[in-house]
UniProtKB/Swiss-Prot annotation:
<dbReference type="InterPro" id="IPR027124">
    <property type="entry name" value="Swc5/CFDP1/2"/>
</dbReference>
<keyword id="KW-0156">Chromatin regulator</keyword>
<dbReference type="GO" id="GO:0000812">
    <property type="term" value="C:Swr1 complex"/>
</dbReference>
<feature type="region of interest" description="Disordered">
    <location>
        <begin position="214"/>
        <end position="238"/>
    </location>
</feature>
<dbReference type="Pfam" id="PF07572">
    <property type="entry name" value="BCNT"/>
</dbReference>
<feature type="domain" description="BCNT-C">
    <location>
        <begin position="260"/>
        <end position="341"/>
    </location>
</feature>
<feature type="region of interest" description="Disordered">
    <location>
        <begin position="142"/>
        <end position="178"/>
    </location>
</feature>
<feature type="compositionally biased region" description="Acidic residues">
    <location>
        <begin position="8"/>
        <end position="20"/>
    </location>
</feature>
<keyword id="KW-0010">Activator</keyword>
<feature type="region of interest" description="Disordered">
    <location>
        <begin position="1"/>
        <end position="126"/>
    </location>
</feature>
<dbReference type="InterPro" id="IPR011421">
    <property type="entry name" value="BCNT-C"/>
</dbReference>
<dbReference type="GO" id="GO:0006338">
    <property type="term" value="P:chromatin remodeling"/>
</dbReference>
<keyword id="KW-0805">Transcription regulation</keyword>
<protein>
    <recommendedName>
        <fullName>SWR1-complex protein 5</fullName>
    </recommendedName>
</protein>
<keyword id="KW-0804">Transcription</keyword>
<comment type="subunit">
    <text>Component of the SWR1 chromatin remodeling complex.</text>
</comment>
<feature type="compositionally biased region" description="Acidic residues">
    <location>
        <begin position="33"/>
        <end position="43"/>
    </location>
</feature>
Length: 342
């Protein structure tokens, strides 16, 4: 049997056999290999699906405690998504390097060291301790509102700046109330009693007229004079009603005139005030009105200049008076000379 089989194998021609097909056998082998790969991939996918389902179930269990219809659940889900994306990007950066290459453990350790070292590697040029000691040792400079003039500039400008800075200080040093005078007067004019009380400038025409009306013995402060005038009208307050615990005396039982508020008492008080008030004539009232008008229109300086000039009315009156005196002197001399001849 063996020799016959060997003879048949020697006489067999594979090219003449119609059933012999080596290409189909190779294709069948390749297809079997690809089928095996597909089966392995399918098994991996089937393994991954349960893991995804488990993750989804865990997330649903975590979200079960929140009200999914409110804003808190939506915000929580958004934060989870952001956290997942950040962790995924960080993992991709750590695992992959330039050109898509996978990093080794040593490369990852070197990158972590670089991230952790935030201090400057160069030389430090500022000594913080010395700077702090210098700041503490310097004296505290008080803050001034006025700027100091530059000494390197023109000295004339420096003098102007100093004088302008000293002017407000001198103005503050002066008491603003010292330049004012209080006018308080009561006068009777045209059958009516007028009472005035106001503050005017000390150098005004009205103030000068008021001080001149008080006389030579008038005090320097007009307010003191006004208080002296009204001191007689002031009275100390007294009790309106007597207490039940006070002893009954003649002084307490006397009638209180200051509590009489009838019309007759008011008229009597007005008459008493009118009798005490100074009666002014037309000339004196005109002087007062003229002084008020001069201060109101600001004619004081102009009137002073006009009064000092030669063309003023006062100067002309003085000239006429001197001329009249000279004529009278010449006439007297002529009479004396004529009497001596006779």
């Amino acid at each position: 049997m063996a020799p016959t089989l060997e003879l048949l194998a020697e006489d067999y021609a594979s090219e003449e056999d119609s059933d012999f097909a080596p290409e189909t056998a190779e294709a069948a082998g390749e297809s079997s290999i690809s089928d095996d790969d597909d089966e392995e991939a399918g098994e991996d996918a089937e393994k991954a699906k349960p893991e995804k389902r488990k993750r989804a179930a865990i997330e649903e269990a975590e979200d079960a405690g929140y009200d999914n219809s409110g804003d808190e659940a939506i915000i929580k889900k958004g934060e989870k998504r952001q956290k997942k994306t950040k962790t995924k990007l960080a993992a991709d950066d750590e695992e992959t390097g330039e050109g898509g290459l996978i990093k080794t453990r040593s490369q990852r350790a070197v990158e972590k060291e670089k991230r952790s070292t935030a201090a400057a590697s160069g030389p430090v040029t500022i000594d913080v301790d010395a700077l702090w000691a210098q700041m503490i040792s310097e004296p505290v400079i008080p803050r001034t509102s006025t700027a100091k003039p530059d000494e390197s500039a023109d000295p004339a400008n420096c003098d102007i700046a100093k004088s302008s800075s000293q002017q407000p200080e001198t103005a503050k040093a002066k008491d603003p109330d010292s330049d004012l005078i209080k006018i308080k007067r009561t006068y009777n004019f045209a059958g009516k009693v007028h009472t005035e009380e106001k503050l005017v400038a000390r150098d005004s025409a009205e103030a000068k007229l008021y001080l001149a009306s008080l006389g030579e013995n008038a005090p320097a402060d007009g307010e003191t004079a006004a208080e002296d005038e009204s001191s007689s009208a002031k009275r100390m307050p007294r009790k309106a009603f007597r207490s039940v615990f006070e002893p009954i005396t003649d002084a307490n039982s006397a009638h209180r005139s200051d509590l009489n508020l009838s019309m007759a008492s008011r008229l009597q008080a007005r008459e008493a005030t009118g009798n005490k008030a100074k009666k002014l004539n037309t000339v004196e009232k005109s002087k007062m009105d003229w002084a008020v008008a001069v201060d109101k229109m600001g004619l004081k300086d102009e009137l002073e200049l006009a009064g000092k000039s030669k063309d003023s009315f006062a100067a002309r009156q003085d000239f006429l008076a001197r001329s009249e005196m000279r004529r009278e002197e010449e006439a007297r001399r002529a009479r004396m000379a004529q009497a001596g001849k006779t």
